[in-house]
Amino acid sequence: MFNQVKKTMEWGEDTLTLETGKIARQADGCVIATYGETSVMAAVTYARSQKPGQDFFPLTVHYNEKYYAAGKIPGGFFKREARPTEKETLTSRLIDRPIRPLFVDGFKNEVLVICTVLSHDLENDPDIVAMIAASAALTISGVPFMGPIAGARVGYEDGEYVLNPVVDDMHDLRNNPDQRLDLVVAGTKDAVMMVESEAYELSEAEMLGAVKFGHEQMQPVIDLIIELAETAAKEPFDFQPADYSELYAKVKAAGEDQMRAAFAITDKQERVTAISAARDAILATLSDEEQTDPNLGSALKKLESSILRGDVVKNGRRIDGRALDTVRPIQSEVGILPRTHGSALFTRGETQGLVVTTLGTGDDEQFIDALHGNFKSNFLLHYNFPPYSVGEVGRFGPPGRREIGHGKLAWRALQAVLPAATDFPYTIRLVSEITESNGSSSMASVCGGSLSMMDAGVPLKAPVAGVAMGLILEEDGSYAVLTDILGDEDHLGDMDFKVAGTEEGITSLQMDIKVAGITPEIMEKALEQAKAGRLHILGEMSKALSEGRSQFSEHAPRIETMQIPTDKIREVIGSGGKVIREIVETSGAKVDINDDGIIKIASANGEAIKKAYEMIHSIVAEPEEGKVYTGTVVKIVDFGAFVNFFGKRDGLVHVSQIENRRLNHPSDVLKEGQEVKVKLLGFDDRGKVRLSMKVVDQETGEEIKKEAPAD
């Protein structure tokens, strides 16, 4: 009934298995990849014809995690998986980026890749397994895909690269000092296609070494996919790229000069207008049939690409007139919004980001319900890219995949320099509003985010800057590496290479390569050129602010941390939370207690923090024997009076300890609610407190000294 094919190999510390032919047989290709006990099913389907008027490649990748894979039931009211989580969105992009450039040029049929996590062993991250499964499913499906690819995760521990570290070591690098790198690399047999990473100030050589290590380690996986395809692959889809050479010749003859003049304009909006006019002029020379040719868009893009690329490689001349290694003019400002906790406006050429920092308490931490466990995050970064930033009318609503991806890239770049939670017990939220964009807006978010946090008083270990690099590689092997690329250079180039870090090293690296042939030497040159650009940007940023402010904004919360014995937690909380509610209501401060006895008291008002601190201290502190306290009479009985003298602590003043004379009843001199001065004499055999009034001057609160006997 099943024509099942299964291939297995040992890879790293576990066994990798690829199998097909048993499940989802109506898909064009379906492979279940299992690494350890983590299993991901990738199913591929594709349309047999191109939609009329389709002028782009409609590839869609969906990665989804099923809670049952880890033996969990989803939270929430509906108890089922709903909209994609951030992890699912980021992994979908992680798979999309290396496979997209490998489809045959000109193929514009719809392709759908769905990766479903079926089992998770809580050790091996499903993202790498999903990438391998997707590559294998595409390879056997018959779609014109020039793969296969494979992926690998690389760690860096004690000076050694580690293949596919376990999930627990990687999900929170900030709190794992032994692990300094989380890098994912994807590539074909001959070339690296994609890199995504977060790091702890590693050098350019260490990062390049990690990329090489990952590419070497994935080679057996590529061989395994090829071995599977030799047995299970379907007949290749008969696709012949359209020949539009005649159309391109007409387009070039009609508009090359005008298009070249348009690309010589340095101002973005003027250039866009001129390019649009050049396109219209070209269309006016074409027949009706040629204007409706589905390859017209490709012909126009080829003309634009040849003009831009030729000028850069042959003449060293960029669109805006800069040298290849020059960064656009930078303007940095901080503290521009009066009521926010921290703010910065970072402008680099025609790219601008307004980044705002908000400080919160433990109550503001983000709760993350992941397959490998539940945890909280106290650092959030949200990136917004409204249509007005590029002068367009467009969709405005919840963040899309691109916004989530760019925000995570900036998050990775900055989290390496954050102070430890024990030293800075605040939740930090950054929001990057991209107000102008002409390339590298995610790196503007990094620069603006660093300045904004320092403006808020966050004690960063070092400022962070980011720069986007580009590459143009010609067929004859000549190439040019571009620093701080524009949007058009990104669109028409062969590599998008974003590097962020401090003066000491790299904290984040993202690379997307669109062509084969990029050698380690080219990557090394790009990294060195990026370092020079990054150091220049850090110098420009330091003109605005070079370290965190010593004072918070008056509108930001202050947090005081105190440690209490764990056996006192119950006393601070009280029955049903009665005591802690009283502390919050009386002081006006927010109070958070964890299971280790660490208490965080937060308020924008210093007096509120002081009041809450004193109330908690009075509950957990032990009174000192021999010390004088001010107390209040809370109850009078025949044998004495009970006095509340130390927070919630009461003690007995025996009738014989009230005055230096005999009393018929304590009520002769005391009444409930009266303030008295008492000395703690000690504790009786049952631990009860013994107090005395008669040894204390009730006016001054001074202890009455016994007169020395006469000689």
From Swiss-Prot:
Enzyme class: transferase
Domain KH: residue ranges: 557-616
EC number: 2.7.7.8
GO MF annotation list: 3'-5'-RNA exonuclease activity; magnesium ion binding; polyribonucleotide nucleotidyltransferase activity; RNA binding
Keyword terms: Cytoplasm, Magnesium, Metal-binding, Nucleotidyltransferase, RNA-binding, Transferase
Domain S1 motif: 626-694
A Pfam family: PNPase
Protein localization: Cytoplasm
Keyword Cell division: no
Catalysed reactions, as listed in the record: RNA(n+1) + phosphate = RNA(n) + a ribonucleoside 5'-diphosphate
GO biological process: mRNA catabolic process; RNA processing
Cofactor(s) the protein requires to work: Mg(2+)
InterPro entries listed in its UniProt record: ExoRNase_PH_dom1, ExoRNase_PH_dom2, ExoRNase_PH_dom2_sf, KH_dom, KH_dom_type_1, KH_dom_type_1_sf, NA-bd_OB-fold, PNPase
Residues annotated to bind Mg(2+): D490, D496
Job description of the protein: Involved in mRNA degradation. Catalyzes the phosphorolysis of single-stranded polyribonucleotides processively in the 3'- to 5'-direction.
The name this protein goes by in its record: Polyribonucleotide nucleotidyltransferase
Species of origin: Dinoroseobacter shibae (strain DSM 16493 / NCIMB 14021 / DFL 12)
Originating gene: pnp
